[in-house]
């Protein structure tokens, strides 16, 4: 295995998808290697069940977002996000893959997102959802520290 110093730094291949009506920002960690993509949009790996779950929940059809048996429909995914006010992005802008796979366990974040910059583009955003531990850890590391909340019960 190569050391992180000899592995290439990958820049994020997609820009944030931020519809004007974004109320919810969904953040993952980083896309899988391009060889695993079935569309040019977020969660492109046909093995990932996110689009199937959303199809089942919103349309009672786990195949709703499938264009073919081996590809998701980028157009349907984007239309859904626009309709529901869902923005999508990742918490890492540059990474090093310690192994040539999609596992968050083997991603080294070089440059995290700037949440202030992203949120400034979506003033109606009410919530942020992260899709995994790596995304959560990366997001938290970019936020300023906060004081302990005051307890009203002693």
Where in the sequence are the language-model features?
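C-terminal edge-of-domain segments
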Residues: 150
């Amino acid at each position: 295995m190569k050391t992180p110093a000899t592995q290439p730094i990958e820049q994020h291949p997609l820009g944030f998808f931020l519809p004007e009506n974004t109320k919810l920002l969904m953040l993952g960690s980083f896309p899988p290697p391009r060889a695993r993509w079935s569309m040019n949009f977020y969660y492109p790996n046909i093995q990932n069940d996110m689009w199937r779950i959303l199809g089942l929940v919103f349309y009672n059809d786990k195949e709703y977002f499938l264009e073919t048996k081996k590809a998701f429909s980028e157009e349907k995914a984007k239309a859904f996000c626009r309709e529901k006010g869902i923005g999508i992005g990742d918490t890492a802008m540059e990474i090093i893959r310690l192994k040539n796979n999609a596992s968050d366990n083997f991603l080294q974040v070089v440059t995290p997102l700037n949440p202030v910059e992203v949120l400034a583009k979506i003033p109606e955003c009410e919530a942020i959802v992260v899709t995994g531990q790596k995304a959560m850890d990366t997001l938290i590391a970019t936020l300023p520290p906060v004081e302990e909340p005051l307890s009203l019960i002693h």
